[in-house]
């Protein structure tokens, strides 16, 4: 019996299979390698949601990488963004003159990505690009900078492959919609 059978039974439906995710992440890695050829990339990864996506992506990039993790969230335990972004910035880390790639799991309201992009821009990196595994098709109050996108999805609350509901379901190999 598969150890995830019980967890998978909590899904209403699978949106993206593990195979779909793996193939798309490999394509994203190739594009990033082309764009950053010959450079050290400083990857800024948003935890905890981007953990699985970032781990999968970085293992496929054949370039030197410096990894910095940040805590940032606008959900705070629910299924809707609170509208308030909480940042946990690392002490003593500078991004000045670096080639920075900001990675997150999902672009939803755009608040988190925009806030972090502005904060990183203020540190005068040589370049600053952003990437997400998922981009929700939804209206946003402001455009969010986005250079790399795995998948465009409808405006639904998703779980799996690092994304959670109240701390659960991150370990799902697929991305799905939770049963109501």
Predicted stretch roles:
Residues 1-180:
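PRPP-associated nucleotide enzymes
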């Amino acid at each position: 019996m598969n150890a995830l059978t019980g967890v998978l039974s909590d899904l209403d439906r699978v949106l993206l299979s593990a195979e779909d995710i793996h193939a798309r992440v490999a394509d994203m890695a190739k594009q990033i390698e082309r764009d950053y050829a010959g450079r050290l990339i400083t990857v800024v990864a948003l935890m905890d949601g981007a953990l699985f996506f970032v781990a999968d992506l970085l293992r496929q990039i054949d370039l030197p990488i410096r990894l910095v993790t940040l805590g940032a969230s606008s959900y705070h335990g629910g299924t809707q963004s609170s509208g308030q972004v909480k940042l946990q910035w690392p002490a003593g880390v500078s991004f000045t003159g670096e080639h920075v790639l900001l990675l997150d799991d999902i672009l939803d309201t755009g608040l988190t990505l925009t806030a972090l992009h502005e904060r990183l821009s203020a540190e005068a990196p040589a370049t600053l690009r952003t990437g997400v595994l998922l981009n929700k098709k939804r209206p946003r109050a402001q455009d969010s900078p986005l250079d790399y996108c795995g998948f465009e999805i409808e405006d639904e609350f998703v779980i799996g492959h690092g994304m959670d509901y109240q701390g659960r379901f991150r370990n799902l190999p697929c991305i799905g919609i939770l049963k109501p």
